[in-house]
């Protein structure tokens, strides 16, 4: 079975662990850089991107994650952290050739659920202070999901990033299955 690490320093970690189990993989909570050893993929969860970024700097994760040669899934704040820029001063991994509009859908009270397409399947996406892709900076970035005309899912190389929270939706397992099939199992 594949071991999928979940960056466990802030955010909705337990929900991702439950979702990983549903796709018959083993979740491993990543609290230190040493925990990155032996994983087949990494999930960077939603949470507060500025806080997660500062903690990644404090715990020495930035360079370690940048140098990983494994698939990475970023959800919500994870998408923000993987981007090249947000227009705000904050620590970023800068692994995806996109800029991000933080909190593009508004505040917490503006959160919503909406059915969108991901890889040819419908998924009930949960958007909580969700980001959107602002600008695509490379032809290597592929759009995998949209909310109307807004880009909410992309992939580039071995990285997938979505602006919604699949771990909070009953059918969110679709996103994890997509990641497993198109990234983890192709490794």
Curated annotation (Swiss-Prot):
Listed GO CC annotations: cytosol; glutaminase complex
Job description of the protein: Catalyzes the hydrolysis of glutamine to glutamate and ammonia as part of the biosynthesis of pyridoxal 5'-phosphate. The resulting ammonia molecule is channeled to the active site of PdxS.
GO biological process: glutamine catabolic process; pyridoxal phosphate biosynthetic process; pyridoxine metabolic process
Pathway(s) of this molecule: Cofactor biosynthesis; pyridoxal 5'-phosphate biosynthesis
The protein, known as: Pyridoxal 5'-phosphate synthase subunit PdxT
Family under the similarity heading: Belongs to the glutaminase PdxT/SNO family.
SUBUNIT field: In the presence of PdxS, forms a dodecamer of heterodimers. Only shows activity in the heterodimer.
InterPro entries hit by this protein: Class_I_gatase-like, PdxT/SNO, PdxT/SNO_CS
Any one GO MF annotation of this record: pyridoxal 5'-phosphate synthase (glutamine hydrolysing) activity
Protein encoded by which gene: pdxT
Pfam families assigned to the protein according to its UniProt record, in alphabetical order: SNO
Active site, per annotation: 76 (nucleophile), 165 (charge relay system), 167 (charge relay system)
């Amino acid at each position: 079975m594949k071991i999928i690490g979940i960056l466990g320093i802030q955010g909705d970690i337990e929900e991702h662990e439950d979702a990983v189990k549903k796709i018959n993989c083993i979740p491993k909570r990543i609290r230190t850089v040493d925990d990155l050893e032996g994983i087949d993929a990494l999930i960077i969860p939603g949470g507060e991107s500025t806080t997660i970024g500062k903690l990644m700097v404090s715990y020495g994760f930035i360079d370690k994650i940048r140098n990983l040669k494994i698939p990475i899934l970023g959800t919500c704040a994870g998408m923000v952290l993987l981007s090249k820029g947000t227009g705000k001063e904050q620590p970023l991994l800068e692994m995806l050739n996109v800029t991000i509009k933080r909190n593009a859908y508004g505040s917490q009270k503006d959160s919503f659920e909406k059915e969108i397409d991901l890889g040819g399947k419908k998924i009930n996406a949960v958007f909580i202070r969700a980001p959107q892709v602002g600008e695509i900076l490379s032809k290597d970035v592929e759009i995998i999901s949209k909310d109307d005309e807004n880009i909410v899912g992309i992939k580039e190389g071995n990285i997938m990033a979505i602006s919604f929270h699949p771990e909070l939706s009953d059918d969110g397992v679709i996103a994890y299955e997509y990641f497993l099939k198109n990234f983890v199992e192709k490794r």
